[in-house]
């Protein structure tokens, strides 16, 4: 439109005052803020689309209460996570070979996978994805299932034709096994996992 104008303001209060002043001046037919919009970051993963993951988006499916969810689509408008963020999952380990998790795993830059050496000299051999504090090894493979489910809720891969999607699908997962196959945890093992996480940037 030829007679339109765009003004800018540095802060929200200044913008609000300017808008109110322009609206009451009778000089303009319409005065509106110039808002930023973006395409929604809604993944195409099956369980999200069909409502099975009702905790992420509840539209009342299966007799549920519409809106009784975590509001994840609003969060995704802000961020889907960052590959620079490492989330330490201190649990029963992670099945890091899972098709929705393999690409999401943090990788220890100081370790060479499969060479049976403690390359980074931290006391754990081949701790590529994290550690197993239960057995004091570098293999945090889940033998219970709980840690894998938690990891999937956090960062299951998106838009990959698989059914699941995580809340922050762009972060990296560090697998820290403090719980055994029966789901029992020792506080010393949890502490060791916390130390490893902090030491390695989680």
PLM features per residue range, with description:
Residues 1-15, 35:
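Aromatic/histidine-rich interaction motifs
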Residues 4-8, 56-66, 148-154:
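Short linear motifs at secondary-structure transitions and domain/linker junctions
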Residues 15-19, 189-193:
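Short, acidic/polar
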Residues 17, 21-86, 94-104, 132:
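Protease zymogen maturation seam
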Residues 19-23, 154, 197:
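Hydrophobic C-terminal alpha-helix "anchor/cap" residues
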Residues 33, 172-174, 196:
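Generic alpha-helical hydrophobic packing signal
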Residues 63, 73-188, 200:
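Subtilisin-like serine protease catalytic core
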Residues 194-202:
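Short acidic, glycine-rich surface-loop motifs adjacent to enzyme active sites
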């Amino acid at each position: 439109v030829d007679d339109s104008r765009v003004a800018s303001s540095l802060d929200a209060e200044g913008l609000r005052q300017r808008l109110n002043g322009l609206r009451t001046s009778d000089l303009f037919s319409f005065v509106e803020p110039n808002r930023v919009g973006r395409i929604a970051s809604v993944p195409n993963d099956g369980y999200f689309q069909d409502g099975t993951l009702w905790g992420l988006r509840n539209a009342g499916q299966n007799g549920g209460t519409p809106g009784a969810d975590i509001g994840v689509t609003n969060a995704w408008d802000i961020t889907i996570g960052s590959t620079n963020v490492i989330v330490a999952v201190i649990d029963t380990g992670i099945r890091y070979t899972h098709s929705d998790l393999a690409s999401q795993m943090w990788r220890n830059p100081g370790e060479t996978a499969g060479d049976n050496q403690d390359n980074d000299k931290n006391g754990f051999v081949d701790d590529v994805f994290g550690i197993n504090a239960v057995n004091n090894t570098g293999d945090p493979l889940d033998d219970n299932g709980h840690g894998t489910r938690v990891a999937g809720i956090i960062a299951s891969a998106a838009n990959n034709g698989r059914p699941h999607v995580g809340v922050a699908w762009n972060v990296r997962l560090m697998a820290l096994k403090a719980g055994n196959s029966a789901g029992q945890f020792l506080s010393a093992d949890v502490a060791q996992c916390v130390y490893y996480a902090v030491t390695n940037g989680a």
